[in-house]
Amino acid sequence: MSPVISHPRSAAARHQSDELSPITITVDCPAKTNLTLEVGPAHDEWGGRHELDTTYCAIGVYDTVTATAKQPGAGFSLELEGAYLGDLASSRSDMRRNHAVLALFAMAQAAEREPDVALTITKRIPVGAGLGGGSADAAATMLAVNRLWELNWPIERLRTIAATLGADMPFCLTGGLAYGTGFGERITDIAPGSRDELALIEQGFSGEVLVGAYQSQLSTPEVYHTFDIVGAAEGDRNHLQAAAISLHPRSGQAIDAATQAGASHAFVSGSGPSVVAFAADEAAAQRIIEVWRDTAVVDRIIRAKSPEHPNISVRQ
């Protein structure tokens, strides 16, 4: 399942909307986790990024990006909202390095337009957490601008642009389930009801999804640097898990607690420190929630569904 992209209007209507579109596009984009994450060698031609073989899963924790056209020549603007902004709220944060702004600039360059767009991001996905919040914001921006400017580019063209910005962004454009290779940017979607999806369900990747989130953040480059030293622990489906736990021990404690409480799977999400636990039923989910609360091994608990997809809405 892909986000809905509307049909193009006439050239005359497009010309009128170029002057100043009254339309506001809102995109809710889900977080991502990695059901498996095998990390290979680093490649100089990829800027030092590691080769990856991963199974992506979009989970129902959503950031919301709203895009509205501004007057020609007005430039872009960015407003951040939400209770969990992390270091994005820092006065030292460079707005032009925000993933959504980079995505806007990339779309403007590809479309040969000026980035005269007002962006508002409502953050719910924890920042610096291994849940792809920045990638979700970038993907949501691309989907919004694609509709706002009536480009109507197919997902594959958007993925080509997204791949120049980051590893997870091509997946976040569609969500659901998918395999990722290369440095994570080469996406093969897993169709609903397919043999591959049924195999994941049989392996226990179904039911309730619980996210154990933290106030603290982990730097992805630091996690990879640590991985280069310590490697992957035997049996870990996420090769970055040992590195993340060495930097953030509470993640390991949360995994142990969830496993003992009956989680089908519990693991560090991506580069961490967030922990994702799958519970087969409501009773197991409640046990995990209770043990996480009682032991204080996580700072925040989020219940979610999976797999999820971006949602696009248009307001005149």
Curated annotation (Swiss-Prot):
It catalyses: 4-CDP-2-C-methyl-D-erythritol + ATP = 4-CDP-2-C-methyl-D-erythritol 2-phosphate + ADP + H(+). It comes from the Bacteria. GO terms for molecular function: 4-(cytidine 5'-diphospho)-2-C-methyl-D-erythritol kinase activity; ATP binding. ATP binds at P126, V127, G128, A129, G130, L131, G132, G133, G134, S135, A136. InterPro entries: GHMP_kinase_C_dom, GHMP_kinase_C_sf, GHMP_kinase_N_dom, IspE, Ribosomal_Su5_D2-typ_SF, Ribsml_uS5_D2-typ_fold_subgr. Pfam families: GHMP_kinases_C (PF08544), GHMP_kinases_N (PF00288). Pathway: Isoprenoid biosynthesis; isopentenyl diphosphate biosynthesis via DXP pathway; isopentenyl diphosphate from 1-deoxy-D-xylulose 5-phosphate: step 3/6. The active site is at K32, D168. This is 4-diphosphocytidyl-2-C-methyl-D-erythritol kinase. It comes from Bifidobacterium longum (strain DJO10A). The gene is ispE.
